[in-house]
Amino acid sequence: TTLTSKKLNGVVWNADINDGELNAKTDYTSILYQASVFNGSANVYAPRYRQAHIYSFFSSDTAKAHAAMEQAYQDVKEAFISYLQLHNHNRPIIIASHSQGTLHAGRLLKEFFEKKS
């Protein structure tokens, strides 16, 4: 989760995917130091999504926090469906995640792969 600005606590619940400053923060932290480990062995597909503000994990406004996480997950899910349809070509998949993305990845795995055999 790179949407962490304290001035946005309880005001902005989800990131704007066109926020250049936030995207650069994500690219030069999470993507550079974590996702790049796969560069030599796999095609990395790391789409932008409207990540929930870190405040969503701690807020007493559980309805808004849940809605923010749900919006983020729906973006991840849509990106995954798009990846499968346009880019995967029936190749094996590695789903790696960190922080908030791990919650979304776990849900994605359950929804798409659990009890599918």
Q: Where do the language-model regions lie?
A:
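Active-site catalytic motif of lipid deacylating hydrolases and related acyltransferases
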Residues: 2-92
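Structured, solvent-exposed acidic/aromatic patches
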Residues: 92-94, 110
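Gly/Ala-rich beta-loop-alpha elbow adjacent to hydrolase catalytic centers
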Residues: 97-101, 105
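Short glycine-enriched nucleophile-adjacent loop
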Residues: 104-113
